[in-house]
């Protein structure tokens, strides 16, 4: 199990502080980020294009938009701290960038949990070539 967790942390294909975001996703959904969220739909994973395929993919679209609104931050690499109080993610102290990145990741992890019932396995490892429709604006 430890090897699987390390692999998930290393391979998770979402932007942000990979360790913290992967941990949040696992805690919220009880699913490993890899394979469930790394190549899902048109937006989960590196980059994104086209129209989100469903509510889970929309979580990733909104997450990408959230990162896009951060100025002078490095969401792919900046580490942050968070804790839980009564099961709720509480973003910790840190720089304004760290706090904003944490809030983006928190919103995505909670969104994944809220949409577990509509998650569709057919969108796992979804080919980019099927994401050709014009992209939405954030």
From Swiss-Prot:
Gene3D superfamilies on file: Phospholipase A2 domain
Activity-regulation annotation: High level of membrane cholesterol content reduces cytolytic activity, whereas low level of membrane cholesterol content increases cytolytic activity.
Residue ranges crossing the lipid bilayer per the database entry: none
- Where is the protein found, in the record's own terms? Secreted
In which tissues or organs does this protein occur?
Expressed by the venom gland.
An example of a GO molecular function for this protein is: phospholipid binding
Major location category of this protein: secreted
GO terms classed as biological process: arachidonate secretion; defense response to bacterium; lipid catabolic process; negative regulation of T cell proliferation; phospholipid metabolic process
Requisite cofactors = Ca(2+)
Catalytic residues identified in the record: 63, 105
Kindly state which keywords UniProt assigns to this record, in alphabetical order.
Antibiotic, Antimicrobial, Calcium, Disulfide bond, Hydrolase, Lipid degradation, Lipid metabolism, Metal-binding, Myotoxin, Secreted, Signal, Toxin
Q: Where is the signal peptide?
A: 1-16
- What cellular component GO annotations does this protein have? extracellular region
Catalyzed reactions per annotation: a 1,2-diacyl-sn-glycero-3-phosphocholine + H2O = a 1-acyl-sn-glycero-3-phosphocholine + a fatty acid + H(+)
EC number(s) stated in the UniProt entry for this protein? 3.1.1.4
Which residues are connected by disulfide bridges in this protein?
42-131, 44-60, 59-111, 65-138, 66-104, 73-97, 91-102
The cross-references to InterPro entries, in alphabetical order and at most eight, read: PLipase_A2, PLipase_A2_Asp_AS, PLipase_A2_dom, PLipase_A2_dom_sf, PLipase_A2_His_AS
Query: What is said about its interaction partners and assembly?
Result: Monomer. Homodimer; non-covalently linked (alternative/compact dimer conformation).
In the record, the note on similarity to other proteins reads: Belongs to the phospholipase A2 family. Group II subfamily. D49 sub-subfamily.
Q: What does this protein do?
A: Snake venom phospholipase A2 (PLA2) that displays local myotoxic activity. It also displays anticoagulant action in plasma and edema-inducing activities. In addition, it shows cytotoxic activity to a variety of cell types and bactericidal activity to a variety of Gram-negative and Gram-positive bacteria. PLA2 catalyzes the calcium-dependent hydrolysis of the 2-acyl groups in 3-sn-phosphoglycerides.
Specify the protein name: Basic phospholipase A2 myotoxin I
Source organism of the structure: Bothrops asper
